[in-house]
Amino acid sequence: MALNKLKNIPSLTNSSHSSINGIASNAANSKPSGADTDDIDENDESGQSILLNIISQLKPGCDLSRITLPTFILEKKSMLERITNQLQFPDVLLEAHSNKDGLQRFVKVVAWYLAGWHIGPRAVKKPLNPILGEHFTAYWDLPNKQQAFYIAEQTSHHPPESAYFYMIPESNIRVDGVVVPKSKFLGNSSAAMMEGLTVLQFLDIKDANGKPEKYTLSQPNVYARGILFGKMRIELGDHMVIMGPKYQVDIEFKTKGFISGTYDAIEGTIKDYDGKEYYQISGKWNDIMYIKDLREKSSKKTVLFDTHQHFPLAPKVRPLEEQGEYESRRLWKKVTDALAVRDHEVATEEKFQIENRQRELAKKRAEDGVEFHSKLFRRAEPGEDLDYYIYKHIPEGTDKHEEQIRSILETAPILPGQTFTEKFSIPAYKKHGIQKN
Protein backbone atom coordinates (compact mmCIF):
# COMPACT_ATOMS: atom_id res chain seq x y z
CA MET A 1 0.00 0.00 0.00
CA ALA A 2 2.62 2.50 -0.91
CA LEU A 3 2.85 6.05 -2.14
CA ASN A 4 -0.02 5.91 -4.62
CA LYS A 5 -2.29 6.34 -1.58
CA LEU A 6 -1.05 9.93 -1.45
CA LYS A 7 -2.61 11.09 -4.71
CA ASN A 8 -5.73 12.57 -3.18
CA ILE A 9 -4.37 13.55 0.23
CA PRO A 10 -4.66 17.35 0.58
CA SER A 11 -1.26 18.86 1.29
CA LEU A 12 0.65 22.10 1.39
CA THR A 13 4.34 22.72 1.58
CA ASN A 14 5.47 22.85 5.21
CA SER A 15 6.31 26.48 5.79
CA SER A 16 7.90 25.70 9.12
CA HIS A 17 6.28 24.86 11.62
CA SER A 18 22.53 26.38 34.10
CA SER A 19 24.41 24.44 31.13
CA ILE A 20 26.83 21.56 31.93
CA ASN A 21 29.43 22.37 29.25
CA GLY A 22 32.70 20.63 29.58
CA ILE A 23 31.62 17.99 32.07
CA ALA A 24 32.57 15.03 29.91
CA SER A 25 35.97 13.47 30.30
CA ASN A 26 38.54 13.28 27.52
CA ALA A 27 37.70 9.61 27.18
CA ALA A 28 34.05 10.40 26.62
CA ASN A 29 34.93 13.00 23.99
CA SER A 30 37.17 10.69 21.99
CA LYS A 31 35.86 9.69 18.58
CA PRO A 32 34.23 6.28 18.14
CA SER A 33 35.96 3.60 16.12
CA GLY A 34 32.99 2.32 14.13
CA ALA A 35 30.89 1.30 17.12
CA ASP A 36 27.41 2.67 17.72
CA THR A 37 27.85 5.15 20.55
CA ASP A 38 24.58 3.94 22.10
CA ASP A 39 26.45 0.69 22.79
CA ILE A 40 29.43 2.37 24.45
CA ASP A 41 29.32 2.54 28.24
CA GLU A 42 30.78 5.94 29.01
CA ASN A 43 30.01 5.95 32.70
CA ASP A 44 33.57 5.24 33.82
CA GLU A 45 35.07 6.57 37.09
CA SER A 46 35.04 10.10 35.70
CA GLY A 47 31.40 9.77 34.64
CA GLN A 48 30.37 8.36 37.99
CA SER A 49 32.13 11.25 39.69
CA ILE A 50 30.02 13.68 37.65
CA LEU A 51 26.82 11.82 38.52
CA LEU A 52 27.82 11.66 42.17
CA ASN A 53 28.32 15.43 42.23
CA ILE A 54 24.81 15.94 40.80
CA ILE A 55 22.99 13.27 42.76
CA SER A 56 24.67 13.84 46.14
CA GLN A 57 22.40 16.86 46.53
CA LEU A 58 19.26 14.72 46.15
CA LYS A 59 17.23 12.71 48.61
CA PRO A 60 16.21 9.10 47.90
CA GLY A 61 12.74 8.98 46.36
CA CYS A 62 12.90 12.47 44.86
CA ASP A 63 11.65 13.22 41.35
CA LEU A 64 14.42 13.25 38.72
CA SER A 65 12.32 14.70 35.91
CA ARG A 66 13.55 18.25 36.54
CA ILE A 67 17.21 17.28 36.96
CA THR A 68 19.57 17.91 34.03
CA LEU A 69 21.70 14.81 33.56
CA PRO A 70 24.97 14.67 31.58
CA THR A 71 24.63 13.82 27.90
CA PHE A 72 26.94 10.80 28.01
CA ILE A 73 24.04 8.72 29.35
CA LEU A 74 21.67 9.75 26.54
CA GLU A 75 20.50 7.50 23.72
CA LYS A 76 20.40 8.99 20.22
CA LYS A 77 16.62 8.92 19.97
CA SER A 78 13.62 10.52 21.59
CA MET A 79 11.22 8.58 23.81
CA LEU A 80 8.60 9.04 21.07
CA GLU A 81 10.76 6.95 18.75
CA ARG A 82 11.89 4.52 21.42
CA ILE A 83 8.27 3.44 21.96
CA THR A 84 8.45 1.81 18.53
CA ASN A 85 10.79 -0.82 20.02
CA GLN A 86 7.63 -2.52 21.26
CA LEU A 87 6.19 -2.63 17.76
CA GLN A 88 9.05 -4.27 15.88
CA PHE A 89 7.69 -7.82 15.84
CA PRO A 90 4.54 -7.39 13.71
CA ASP A 91 4.80 -11.02 12.57
CA VAL A 92 4.00 -12.19 16.11
CA LEU A 93 1.09 -9.76 16.36
CA LEU A 94 -0.28 -10.90 12.99
CA GLU A 95 -0.01 -14.53 14.16
CA ALA A 96 -2.00 -13.64 17.28
CA HIS A 97 -4.71 -11.96 15.24
CA SER A 98 -5.05 -14.88 12.82
CA ASN A 99 -5.41 -17.52 15.54
CA LYS A 100 -9.00 -18.73 15.81
CA ASP A 101 -8.68 -20.04 19.37
CA GLY A 102 -9.21 -17.40 22.07
CA LEU A 103 -6.72 -18.88 24.53
CA GLN A 104 -3.98 -19.36 21.94
CA ARG A 105 -4.65 -15.85 20.66
CA PHE A 106 -4.06 -14.54 24.18
CA VAL A 107 -0.82 -16.55 24.43
CA LYS A 108 0.42 -14.97 21.20
CA VAL A 109 -0.50 -11.49 22.44
CA VAL A 110 1.62 -12.18 25.53
CA ALA A 111 4.51 -13.33 23.32
CA TRP A 112 4.22 -10.21 21.17
CA TYR A 113 4.22 -7.83 24.12
CA LEU A 114 7.18 -9.55 25.76
CA ALA A 115 9.15 -9.64 22.51
CA GLY A 116 10.22 -6.01 22.29
CA TRP A 117 11.59 -5.26 25.75
CA HIS A 118 15.10 -6.47 24.92
CA ILE A 119 15.55 -3.98 22.06
CA GLY A 120 17.76 -1.09 23.09
CA PRO A 121 21.32 0.13 23.55
CA ARG A 122 23.84 -2.32 24.95
CA ALA A 123 25.09 0.39 27.29
CA VAL A 124 22.94 2.09 29.93
CA LYS A 125 21.33 4.98 28.07
CA LYS A 126 18.08 6.89 28.53
CA PRO A 127 16.11 8.29 25.60
CA LEU A 128 15.86 12.02 25.08
CA ASN A 129 12.95 13.57 26.96
CA PRO A 130 10.51 14.86 24.31
CA ILE A 131 9.62 18.52 24.49
CA LEU A 132 6.00 19.61 24.67
CA GLY A 133 4.37 19.29 21.25
CA GLU A 134 7.15 17.18 19.79
CA HIS A 135 5.86 14.50 17.44
CA PHE A 136 7.18 11.46 15.58
CA THR A 137 5.67 9.39 12.78
CA ALA A 138 6.83 6.19 11.13
CA TYR A 139 5.64 3.31 8.99
CA TRP A 140 6.47 -0.32 8.28
CA ASP A 141 6.37 -2.23 5.00
CA LEU A 142 5.31 -5.63 6.30
CA PRO A 143 6.27 -9.01 4.82
CA ASN A 144 2.58 -9.66 4.00
CA LYS A 145 2.63 -6.59 1.67
CA GLN A 146 0.54 -4.53 4.09
CA GLN A 147 1.65 -1.37 5.89
CA ALA A 148 1.61 -0.34 9.52
CA PHE A 149 1.47 3.30 10.63
CA TYR A 150 2.64 5.02 13.84
CA ILE A 151 1.96 8.51 15.22
CA ALA A 152 3.17 9.85 18.59
CA GLU A 153 3.15 13.21 20.36
CA GLN A 154 4.35 14.61 23.66
CA THR A 155 1.12 15.74 25.29
CA SER A 156 2.52 16.79 28.69
CA HIS A 157 5.94 17.82 29.98
CA HIS A 158 5.46 17.92 33.77
CA PRO A 159 4.70 15.13 34.32
CA PRO A 160 6.04 13.76 31.03
CA GLU A 161 3.43 11.89 29.01
CA SER A 162 3.71 10.51 25.48
CA ALA A 163 0.62 9.43 23.54
CA TYR A 164 0.82 7.09 20.55
CA PHE A 165 -1.25 5.35 17.90
CA TYR A 166 -0.35 2.31 15.75
CA MET A 167 -2.46 0.52 13.19
CA ILE A 168 -2.31 -2.21 10.56
CA PRO A 169 -5.55 -1.28 8.78
CA GLU A 170 -5.74 -4.23 6.38
CA SER A 171 -5.39 -6.68 9.27
CA ASN A 172 -7.86 -4.79 11.50
CA ILE A 173 -5.27 -4.30 14.26
CA ARG A 174 -5.13 -1.10 16.30
CA VAL A 175 -2.93 -0.10 19.24
CA ASP A 176 -3.35 3.04 21.36
CA GLY A 177 -1.21 3.92 24.34
CA VAL A 178 0.36 6.40 26.70
CA VAL A 179 3.79 6.26 28.30
CA VAL A 180 4.12 8.07 31.64
CA PRO A 181 7.61 7.55 33.11
CA LYS A 182 8.04 9.00 36.60
CA SER A 183 11.73 9.09 37.48
CA LYS A 184 12.97 8.56 41.02
CA PHE A 185 16.39 8.55 42.67
CA LEU A 186 16.91 5.45 44.83
CA GLY A 187 20.47 5.79 46.08
CA ASN A 188 22.75 3.79 43.78
CA SER A 189 19.86 3.33 41.35
CA SER A 190 17.41 5.46 39.44
CA ALA A 191 13.98 4.22 38.48
CA ALA A 192 11.46 5.04 35.80
CA MET A 193 8.11 4.05 37.26
CA MET A 194 6.05 3.31 34.17
CA GLU A 195 2.46 4.36 34.80
CA GLY A 196 1.28 4.19 31.21
CA LEU A 197 -1.01 1.71 29.49
CA THR A 198 -1.34 0.08 26.08
CA VAL A 199 -4.68 -0.90 24.53
CA LEU A 200 -4.64 -3.47 21.72
CA GLN A 201 -7.77 -4.14 19.66
CA PHE A 202 -8.57 -6.75 17.03
CA LEU A 203 -11.30 -4.81 15.29
CA ASP A 204 -12.77 -7.70 13.32
CA ILE A 205 -13.01 -10.10 16.29
CA LYS A 206 -16.00 -9.37 18.51
CA ASP A 207 -16.29 -10.06 22.23
CA ALA A 208 -19.42 -11.23 24.05
CA ASN A 209 -20.82 -7.69 23.91
CA GLY A 210 -20.27 -7.35 20.18
CA LYS A 211 -17.37 -4.93 20.62
CA PRO A 212 -13.84 -5.35 19.19
CA GLU A 213 -11.70 -7.78 21.18
CA LYS A 214 -9.59 -5.66 23.52
CA TYR A 215 -6.44 -6.24 25.56
CA THR A 216 -5.01 -3.84 28.13
CA LEU A 217 -1.29 -4.09 28.82
CA SER A 218 0.71 -2.36 31.55
CA GLN A 219 4.48 -1.83 31.60
CA PRO A 220 7.27 -3.03 33.89
CA ASN A 221 9.34 -0.42 35.70
CA VAL A 222 12.88 0.34 34.51
CA TYR A 223 15.85 0.54 36.88
CA ALA A 224 19.36 1.82 36.18
CA ARG A 225 21.63 0.14 38.71
CA GLY A 226 25.13 1.17 39.73
CA ILE A 227 24.85 4.84 38.82
CA LEU A 228 27.27 5.90 41.59
CA PHE A 229 29.48 2.85 42.10
CA GLY A 230 29.82 -0.58 40.57
CA LYS A 231 28.93 -1.52 37.01
CA MET A 232 25.90 0.17 35.50
CA ARG A 233 23.18 -2.04 34.07
CA ILE A 234 19.49 -1.89 33.24
CA GLU A 235 16.93 -4.04 35.04
CA LEU A 236 13.23 -4.35 34.38
CA GLY A 237 11.33 -4.92 37.58
CA ASP A 238 8.00 -5.37 39.32
CA HIS A 239 4.88 -6.41 37.38
CA MET A 240 3.36 -6.26 33.92
CA VAL A 241 -0.34 -7.15 33.68
CA ILE A 242 -2.10 -8.18 30.48
CA MET A 243 -5.89 -8.50 30.51
CA GLY A 244 -8.00 -9.85 27.66
CA PRO A 245 -11.69 -10.72 27.28
CA LYS A 246 -11.38 -14.12 28.99
CA TYR A 247 -7.79 -14.47 30.21
CA GLN A 248 -5.20 -12.52 32.15
CA VAL A 249 -1.59 -12.78 33.24
CA ASP A 250 0.50 -10.99 35.86
CA ILE A 251 4.13 -11.32 34.83
CA GLU A 252 6.72 -10.54 37.48
CA PHE A 253 10.00 -9.08 36.26
CA LYS A 254 12.36 -10.25 38.98
CA THR A 255 15.22 -8.03 40.09
CA LYS A 256 18.40 -9.57 41.43
CA GLY A 257 18.87 -9.53 45.19
CA PHE A 258 22.11 -8.53 46.90
CA ILE A 259 23.03 -12.12 47.71
CA SER A 260 20.93 -14.47 45.60
CA GLY A 261 18.81 -14.48 42.50
CA THR A 262 19.51 -13.90 38.83
CA TYR A 263 19.20 -11.01 36.44
CA ASP A 264 16.36 -10.54 33.96
CA ALA A 265 14.10 -13.43 35.03
CA ILE A 266 10.35 -13.35 34.47
CA GLU A 267 7.54 -15.49 35.85
CA GLY A 268 3.78 -15.47 35.47
CA THR A 269 0.69 -17.64 35.12
CA ILE A 270 -2.03 -17.29 32.50
CA LYS A 271 -5.44 -17.66 34.17
CA ASP A 272 -9.08 -17.10 33.39
CA TYR A 273 -11.15 -14.75 35.54
CA ASP A 274 -12.34 -17.64 37.71
CA GLY A 275 -8.75 -18.38 38.71
CA LYS A 276 -8.23 -21.51 36.60
CA GLU A 277 -4.58 -21.78 35.56
CA TYR A 278 -3.60 -22.63 31.98
CA TYR A 279 0.04 -21.78 31.31
CA GLN A 280 3.18 -20.81 33.19
CA ILE A 281 5.53 -18.22 31.68
CA SER A 282 9.24 -18.27 32.61
CA GLY A 283 12.71 -17.48 31.28
CA LYS A 284 14.50 -14.19 30.70
CA TRP A 285 13.01 -11.18 28.94
CA ASN A 286 16.26 -10.48 27.08
CA ASP A 287 17.06 -14.10 26.20
CA ILE A 288 14.64 -17.03 25.83
CA MET A 289 11.13 -17.08 27.29
CA TYR A 290 9.29 -20.34 27.90
CA ILE A 291 5.71 -21.53 28.27
CA LYS A 292 4.40 -24.66 30.03
CA ASP A 293 0.88 -26.10 29.87
CA LEU A 294 -0.32 -26.48 33.48
CA ARG A 295 -3.29 -28.63 32.47
CA GLU A 296 -1.07 -31.60 31.64
CA LYS A 297 1.13 -33.12 34.37
CA SER A 298 3.61 -34.49 31.85
CA SER A 299 3.87 -31.20 29.99
CA LYS A 300 7.33 -29.75 29.46
CA LYS A 301 8.15 -26.13 28.86
CA THR A 302 8.58 -25.02 25.26
CA VAL A 303 9.92 -21.82 23.74
CA LEU A 304 7.46 -18.92 23.77
CA PHE A 305 9.86 -16.40 22.25
CA ASP A 306 13.60 -16.54 21.52
CA THR A 307 15.18 -13.11 21.20
CA HIS A 308 18.13 -14.65 19.35
CA GLN A 309 16.00 -16.23 16.62
CA HIS A 310 13.61 -13.36 15.90
CA PHE A 311 14.88 -10.18 14.31
CA PRO A 312 13.11 -6.86 14.82
CA LEU A 313 11.64 -4.96 11.89
CA ALA A 314 12.68 -1.35 12.37
CA PRO A 315 10.30 1.45 11.37
CA LYS A 316 10.86 3.66 8.35
CA VAL A 317 10.84 7.45 8.69
CA ARG A 318 10.45 10.26 6.16
CA PRO A 319 13.64 12.04 5.04
CA LEU A 320 14.89 14.71 7.42
CA GLU A 321 14.42 17.47 4.85
CA GLU A 322 10.67 16.71 4.73
CA GLN A 323 10.20 16.91 8.50
CA GLY A 324 8.79 19.78 10.52
CA GLU A 325 10.86 21.53 13.16
CA TYR A 326 9.01 19.73 15.98
CA GLU A 327 9.51 16.24 14.55
CA SER A 328 11.84 14.23 16.76
CA ARG A 329 14.71 13.45 14.40
CA ARG A 330 14.91 16.96 12.98
CA LEU A 331 14.41 18.62 16.37
CA TRP A 332 17.24 16.70 18.05
CA LYS A 333 19.54 16.33 15.02
CA LYS A 334 22.35 18.56 16.30
CA VAL A 335 22.26 16.77 19.65
CA THR A 336 22.26 13.27 18.16
CA ASP A 337 24.97 14.20 15.64
CA ALA A 338 27.16 15.33 18.52
CA LEU A 339 26.38 12.20 20.52
CA ALA A 340 27.30 10.08 17.49
CA VAL A 341 30.87 11.42 17.63
CA ARG A 342 30.88 11.62 21.45
CA ASP A 343 31.23 15.39 21.44
CA HIS A 344 29.39 15.93 24.70
CA GLU A 345 30.23 19.60 24.98
CA VAL A 346 28.34 20.34 21.76
CA ALA A 347 25.56 17.87 22.66
CA THR A 348 25.07 19.59 26.01
CA GLU A 349 24.97 23.06 24.48
CA GLU A 350 22.53 22.09 21.72
CA LYS A 351 20.28 20.29 24.19
CA PHE A 352 20.33 23.33 26.46
CA GLN A 353 19.29 25.61 23.58
CA ILE A 354 16.26 23.42 22.77
CA GLU A 355 15.16 23.13 26.38
CA ASN A 356 15.76 26.80 27.16
CA ARG A 357 13.56 27.77 24.22
CA GLN A 358 10.82 25.59 25.71
CA ARG A 359 11.16 27.33 29.07
CA GLU A 360 10.77 30.68 27.33
CA LEU A 361 7.65 29.50 25.51
CA ALA A 362 6.17 28.11 28.73
CA LYS A 363 6.83 31.41 30.50
CA LYS A 364 5.16 33.33 27.67
CA ARG A 365 2.09 31.07 27.79
CA ALA A 366 1.85 31.60 31.55
CA GLU A 367 2.12 35.38 31.17
CA ASP A 368 -0.54 35.42 28.45
CA GLY A 369 -2.81 32.97 30.25
CA VAL A 370 -2.67 30.59 27.28
CA GLU A 371 -2.98 26.83 27.74
CA PHE A 372 -0.94 24.43 25.61
CA HIS A 373 -3.00 22.12 23.38
CA SER A 374 -1.60 19.13 21.54
CA LYS A 375 -2.14 18.96 17.78
CA LEU A 376 -2.54 15.23 17.20
CA PHE A 377 -4.04 13.76 20.37
CA ARG A 378 -7.17 14.84 22.21
CA ARG A 379 -7.98 14.32 25.86
CA ALA A 380 -9.98 11.21 26.69
CA GLU A 381 -13.71 11.27 27.16
CA PRO A 382 -15.48 9.68 30.17
CA GLY A 383 -15.23 5.90 30.14
CA GLU A 384 -12.16 5.66 27.90
CA ASP A 385 -9.09 3.70 29.05
CA LEU A 386 -6.32 6.21 28.31
CA ASP A 387 -5.59 9.87 28.99
CA TYR A 388 -5.23 10.72 25.30
CA TYR A 389 -6.34 9.34 21.94
CA ILE A 390 -5.53 10.34 18.39
CA TYR A 391 -8.01 13.07 17.44
CA LYS A 392 -8.80 11.69 13.99
CA HIS A 393 -11.84 9.47 13.61
CA ILE A 394 -10.71 6.24 11.98
CA PRO A 395 -13.66 4.72 10.07
CA GLU A 396 -14.97 1.48 11.52
CA GLY A 397 -15.62 -1.64 9.50
CA THR A 398 -13.56 -4.47 8.08
CA ASP A 399 -14.30 -3.31 4.52
CA LYS A 400 -13.06 0.26 4.97
CA HIS A 401 -9.30 -0.16 4.81
CA GLU A 402 -8.88 2.48 2.08
CA GLU A 403 -10.77 5.06 4.15
CA GLN A 404 -8.84 4.07 7.28
CA ILE A 405 -5.50 4.54 5.56
CA ARG A 406 -6.63 7.86 4.16
CA SER A 407 -7.72 9.09 7.60
CA ILE A 408 -4.41 8.09 9.15
CA LEU A 409 -2.38 9.82 6.43
CA GLU A 410 -4.50 12.96 6.77
CA THR A 411 -3.63 13.19 10.47
CA ALA A 412 0.07 13.90 9.97
CA PRO A 413 2.72 13.28 7.30
CA ILE A 414 3.94 9.68 7.59
CA LEU A 415 5.02 8.49 4.15
CA PRO A 416 7.81 10.06 2.04
CA GLY A 417 6.47 12.87 -0.12
CA GLN A 418 3.69 13.88 2.26
CA THR A 419 3.60 17.49 3.39
CA PHE A 420 1.83 19.35 6.18
CA THR A 421 -1.73 20.53 5.62
CA GLU A 422 -3.12 23.85 6.82
CA LYS A 423 -5.13 21.96 9.44
CA PHE A 424 -2.06 20.49 11.11
CA SER A 425 -1.50 23.44 13.48
CA ILE A 426 -5.11 23.48 14.69
CA PRO A 427 -5.38 22.04 18.24
CA ALA A 428 -6.50 18.42 18.32
CA TYR A 429 -9.56 19.11 20.46
CA LYS A 430 -10.89 21.56 17.88
CA LYS A 431 -10.30 19.18 14.98
CA HIS A 432 -11.96 16.40 16.94
CA GLY A 433 -14.93 18.64 17.71
CA ILE A 434 -15.37 19.56 14.05
CA GLN A 435 -15.56 15.86 13.17
CA LYS A 436 -18.30 15.25 15.76
CA ASN A 437 -20.49 18.13 14.55
Swiss-Prot record:
One of its GO terms (biological process) is piecemeal microautophagy of the nucleus. It holds the Pfam family Oxysterol_BP. ipid transport protein (LTP) involved in non-vesicular transfer of lipids between membranes. Functions in phosphoinositide-coupled directional transport of various lipids by carrying the lipid molecule in a hydrophobic pocket and transferring it between membranes through the cytosol. Involved in maintenance of intracellular sterol distribution and homeostasis. Involved in lipid countertransport between the endoplasmic reticulum and the plasma membrane. This is Oxysterol-binding protein homolog 7. A 1,2-diacyl-sn-glycero-3-phospho-(1D-myo-inositol 4-phosphate) binds at residues 64-69, 126-129, 157-158, 351, 355, 359. Belongs to the OSBP family. Residues 23-42 are annotated as: Disordered. Residues 23-32 have a biased composition (Polar residues). Its main location: cytoplasm. PROSITE patterns: OSBP. One of its GO terms (molecular function) is phosphatidylinositol-4-phosphate binding. It catalyses: a 1,2-diacyl-sn-glycero-3-phospho-L-serine(in) = a 1,2-diacyl-sn-glycero-3-phospho-L-serine(out). Residues 54-393 are annotated as: OSBP-related domain (ORD). A 1,2-diacyl-sn-glycero-3-phospho-L-serine binds at residues 64-69, 129, 183. Present with 2350 molecules/cell in log phase SD medium. GO terms for cellular component: cortical endoplasmic reticulum; cytoplasm; cytosol; endoplasmic reticulum membrane; membrane; plasma membrane. Interacts with the AAA ATPase VPS4; regulates OSH7 membrane association. VPS4 is required for membrane dissociation of OSH7. It comes from Saccharomyces cerevisiae (strain ATCC 204508 / S288c) (Baker's yeast). It comes from the Eukaryota. The OSBP-related domain (ORD) mediates binding of sterols and phospholipids. It displays an incomplete beta-barrel containing a central hydrophobic tunnel that can accommodate a single lipid molecule with a flexible lid covering the tunnel entrance. The ORD can bind two membranes simultaneously. It has at least two membrane-binding surfaces; one near the mouth of the lipid-binding pocket and a distal site that can bind a second membrane.
